[in-house]
């Protein structure tokens, strides 16, 4: 990176990319009607005026539109990506050029990634709100508080975890800060009004902390808004999965045996995508309900111990760990392709490949590696087991991200304006806001909504203007 791409207020790949980024941001705005409508609705009131917001979310063109929406509503912002491969460098440069501190470039090391997350949180008086994706900013604060409390009790700097490489990096960073300021994270947590979390994996973390009484501030589960999970997770993945695989490999998908591991909303989108391309699609599942859904859609539901021997393309969608193991990959056919579209790189045992000296790693191009076994067999691993759609392509289309990000903005407004209503628990946005997000996107698609009569509304026992479904309705 050139020196002009690093300053106290930003770290990006190349500030010379800013104008390119600006042109793409303008294009994306035309496809993000929800965010643009929110800007117009709140233009005069600035409902986030004075709010200090930290973002830990993929630094893409679509995220740039989110950032500028939050800024137009009055917020101060600092931003980092939530994945080492997901940043679009021209988007980061365009945002840095506006004066918003942003710390992100495609291909960060893990040490840089956590340092940039730390920088995004480093307001002089601390952040008041967090926009999180995967929960890493939230994790850093909670783990920091935990270590500060341990230090206060024992007088000893806590040992660095060796459970995995990434946690070791996090703990080393926290220990350095501990020796500078032993109450840094506790002060930050006290000043936080809440977090809005974007994705399934991060939401799981939040509910786990809330159940254990460990959550330090209120949280909004944006992921489970219907206009997020049933659109971003399904329709977004249905398009961006194929985009990532195609850009990475140029492989013909028609006729291939494609195995989708997991059949939640993300898995459903991936299975539909492969089916639409003419692939022979199989699904693995642990949940009998999801397995039955897959079977009723015409997909073969199989066991991975068998599928690993004949599949051509594998994608993990579960949010779990060790879904594709080293033993699975040992028996895969020559030239099989392995990738992940869950948030973290834990679904595929990639370290068992990259750390094995008996295997040879051939980098075809960035984020595309062929792993060669001693007998000459090769499999292709995309994005080193991280998000294939963002590591090997540019993520979901702008329109579907407008759904998700409009929910994020509404959650941030709610936390900022009504923080006294919320305890240290996990909340979801009310149904009427979910329906509002959907309404904001209808005209862009030429949708004409039917309006019920008063008689019809009375018959169903719902308001004419909604909400139309009970909270437990599954869509």
Swiss-Prot record:
EC number: 3.13.2.1
Binding site for substrate: 60, 133, 198, 228, 232
Annotated organism of origin: Syntrophotalea carbinolica (strain DSM 2380 / NBRC 103641 / GraBd1) (Pelobacter carbinolicus)
UniProt xrefs under Pfam families: AdoHcyase, AdoHcyase_NAD
Any GO molecular function: adenosylhomocysteinase activity
Pathway membership: Amino-acid biosynthesis; L-homocysteine biosynthesis; L-homocysteine from S-adenosyl-L-homocysteine: step 1/1
GO cellular component: cytosol
Annotated InterPro entries: Adenosylhomocyst_ase-like_sf, Adenosylhomocysteinase-like, Ado_hCys_hydrolase_NAD-bd, NAD(P)-bd_dom_sf, S-Ado-L-homoCys_hydrolase_CS
Superkingdom of origin organism: Bacteria
Keyword set includes NAD: yes
UniProt cross-references to SMART domains, sorted A to Z: AdoHcyase, AdoHcyase_NAD
This protein's UniProt keywords: Cytoplasm, Hydrolase, NAD, One-carbon metabolism
PROSITE patterns: ADOHCYASE_1, ADOHCYASE_2
Purpose of the protein: May play a key role in the regulation of the intracellular concentration of adenosylhomocysteine.
Catalytic activity: S-adenosyl-L-homocysteine + H2O = L-homocysteine + adenosine
Protein name: Adenosylhomocysteinase
Cellular location(s): Cytoplasm
Cofactor(s) essential for the protein: NAD(+)
Keyword NAD: yes
CDD domains: SAHH
SUPFAM superfamilies xrefs: Formate/glycerate dehydrogenase catalytic domain-like, NAD(P)-binding Rossmann-fold domains
Family, similarity comment: Belongs to the adenosylhomocysteinase family.
GO biological process: one example: S-adenosylmethionine cycle
């Amino acid at each position: 990176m050139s020196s002009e791409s690093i300053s106290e207020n930003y770290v990006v790949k190349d500030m010379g990319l800013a104008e390119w980024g600006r042109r793409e941001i303008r294009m994306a705005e035309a496809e993000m009607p929800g965010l643009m409508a929110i800007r117009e609705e709140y233009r005069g009131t600035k409902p986030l005026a004075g709010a200090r917001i930290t973002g830990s979310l993929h630094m893409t063109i679509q995220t740039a539109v989110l950032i500028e929406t939050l800024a137009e509503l009055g917020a101060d912002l600092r931003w980092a990506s939530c994945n080492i491969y997901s940043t679009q460098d021209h988007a980061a440069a365009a945002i840095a050029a506006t004066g918003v501190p942003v710390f992100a470039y495609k291909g960060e090391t893990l040490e840089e990634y956590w340092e940039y997350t730390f920088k995004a949180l480093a307001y002089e008086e601390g952040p008041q709100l967090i926009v999180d994706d995967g929960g890493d900013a939230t994790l850093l604060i909670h783990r920091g508080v935990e270590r500060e409390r341990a230090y206060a009790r024992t007088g000893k700097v806590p040992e660095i975890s060796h459970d995995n490489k990434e946690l070791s990096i996090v703990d080393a960073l926290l220990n350095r800060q501990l020796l500078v300021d032993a109450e840094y994270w506790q002060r930050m947590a006290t000043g936080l009004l809440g977090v809005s979390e974007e994705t399934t994996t991060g939401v799981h973390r939040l509910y786990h902390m809330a159940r254990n009484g460990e959550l330090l501030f209120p949280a909004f589960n944006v992921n489970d808004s219907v206009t997020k999970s049933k659109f971003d997770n399904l329709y977004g993945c249905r398009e961006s999965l194929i985009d990532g695989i195609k850009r990475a490999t140029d492989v013909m998908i028609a006729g291939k045996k494609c195995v989708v591991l997991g059949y939640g909303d993300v898995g459903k989108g991936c299975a539909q995508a492969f089916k639409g391309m003419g692939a022979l699609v199989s699904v693995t599942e642990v949940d009998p309900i999801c397995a039955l859904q897959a079977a009723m859609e015409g997909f073969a539901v199989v066991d991975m111990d068998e599928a690993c021997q004949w599949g051509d393309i594998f994608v993990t969608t579960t949010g779990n760990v060790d879904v594709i193991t080293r033993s699975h990959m040992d028996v895969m056919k020559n030239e099989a392709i392995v990738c992940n579209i869950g948030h973290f790189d834990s679904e595929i045992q990639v370290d068992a490949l990259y750390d094995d000296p008996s295997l040879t790693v051939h980098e075809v191009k960035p984020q595309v590696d062929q792993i060669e076994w001693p007998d000459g067999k090769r499999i292709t691993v995309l994005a080193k087991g991280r998000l294939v759609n963002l590591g090997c392509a540019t993520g979901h289309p702008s329109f579907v991200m407008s759904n998700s990000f409009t929910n994020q903005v509404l959650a941030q407004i709610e936390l900022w304006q009504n923080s006294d209503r919320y305890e240290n628990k996990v909340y979801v946005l009310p149904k009427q806001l979910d329906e509002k997000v959907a309404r904001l996107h209808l005209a862009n698609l030429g949708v004409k909504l039917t309006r019920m009569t008063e008689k019809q509304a009375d018959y169903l026992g719902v308001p004419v203007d909604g909400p139309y479904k009970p909270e437990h309705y599954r869509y």
